[in-house]
Amino acid sequence: MASDLRISFQGEPSRNDPGSENLEHKPSQGPAVQEEEETYEFLRTQLSLLQNSNNSCARQELQNLYKLFHSWLQPEKHSKDEIISCLVLEQFMINGHCSDRSMLKEKWNASGRNLEKFMEDLTDESMKPPGLVHVHMQGQEALFSENMPLKEVIVHLTKQLSVGSPTGTDMETPSWTPQDTSLETGQGEWGDKENGDNIYHINDSITSQGNEIPSLLIIREEDYPRPEEDSVSLKNPLSSRKAGLGMSGSQEGSLKGPSYQDVLMEGGPGFLSQSIQVSPEPVPTHQRTEGNSTRGGHQERCREAQNSYRCEKCPKIFRYFSQLKAHQRRHNNERTFTCAECNRGFFQASDLHVHQKIHAEEKPFTCSTCEKSFSHKTNLLAHERIHTGEKPYECSLCHRSYRQSSTYHRHLRNHQKSAFRGVSSTPEAS
């Protein structure tokens, strides 16, 4: 997005252009947050202008983009540094580097929208590595970035399929900017933050050679085990501009809202109900490929990830047995990690460590309204919302708002469970 913003609109509007007068813009009123939300809504509604007549469509689109960015950035109110800082933060979130957009925006507002102060409080905990997706199509397979458009994935696998024929040529590794990636299976360097592999079929509307609709088996991959986390989230609607593995048109990508732990890829419950394929445990996820020797080493690298483990009580899938056992403790309510001071039990050691900070005497963060102290700044921010009435966590499916992220995540899990119940009642896709 940053490169697109280099287009300059500082030139004088043409007198012969009947639409050039629309480039004048008055400063918008109201809170900055409300303006930003209205701006993105305005952008979505203006996409229909692309269907207008050929002689005015491009000009009208540029005028609308100018109004959009002028309303958002407000150059008459903010300095160049403030505008650049705002664009840097937005690009940072669009690239999928943040694990929790809401928390990042809270820190941004708390810093007074000052980039230097914001970076001082920013930690690597807010970062997440880009996810990789293991894709099977008609005997071909590869690892792709979750941000790579589905059309590009199909094009690459179609080329790889033609390589398997006697007349084929050497297989090419696709490149895609800005995320730049398709990695062969087993060569991923980043890994995925998911606790396990999510398996589902997609029959996309994009047709391949011969007007056949390719069938894809997409598996969420990971390169290293991580303890199961309790948070779930769906995509923030503001990140819909980001390209990714999703439906054609918008090409929605990785789950953006806040972090996408234990939630299947884009589309919401409607998409889940038509894409998930349930199978008994354990689930073999690796499909054996046939062809020339160029795929022999490829199979060897996938051999260690040949089996996955499915929970018997819910449709979640885990690559490692240890992750499955940790997950099953939640179903059985086995809180094996106990606090020595208050005897409260927890499912994971990491949860216990976070809890033990509550018993620490040091509580440097104090509420300016009621003078209640907290050991963590995030707890203070959540507490202050009680006084302000702010509810920043809004569900994109039912538009209910919540004050705390934990309540919001619990609500999202209810949506997820409803989607899985709908899947279990439908016949298995062929």
UniProtKB/Swiss-Prot annotation:
Pfam families xrefs: SCAN (PF02023), zf-C2H2 (PF00096)
Keyword presence, Ligase: no
PROSITE patterns: SCAN_BOX, ZINC_FINGER_C2H2_1, ZINC_FINGER_C2H2_2
UniProt entry keywords in alphabetical sequence: Chromosome, DNA-binding, Metal-binding, Nucleus, Repeat, Telomere, Transcription, Transcription regulation, Zinc, Zinc-finger
GO biological process: telomere maintenance via telomere lengthening
GO CC, one annotated term: transcription regulator complex
InterPro entries: SCAN_dom, SCAN_sf, Znf_C2H2_sf, Znf_C2H2_type
Record-annotated SCAN box domain positions: 44-126
Stretches the record annotates as Disordered: 1-38, 164-196, 224-257, 281-300
Keyword Endoplasmic reticulum: no
Zn finger region (C2H2-type): 309-331, 337-359, 365-387, 393-415
Superkingdom, taxonomy of origin: Eukaryota
SMART domains per record: SCAN, ZnF_C2H2
Molecular function (Gene Ontology), one example: DNA-binding transcription factor activity, RNA polymerase II-specific
Biased composition (Polar residues): 164-185
Subcellular location: Nucleus; Chromosome, Telomere
Function comment: Embryonic stem (ES) cell-specific transcription factor required to regulate ES cell pluripotency. Binds telomeres and plays a key role in genomic stability in ES cells by regulating telomere elongation. Acts as an activator of spontaneous telomere sister chromatid exchange (T-SCE) and telomere elongation in undifferentiated ES cells.
The name this protein goes by in its record: Zinc finger and SCAN domain-containing protein 4
Species whose genome carries this gene: Ailuropoda melanoleuca (Giant panda)
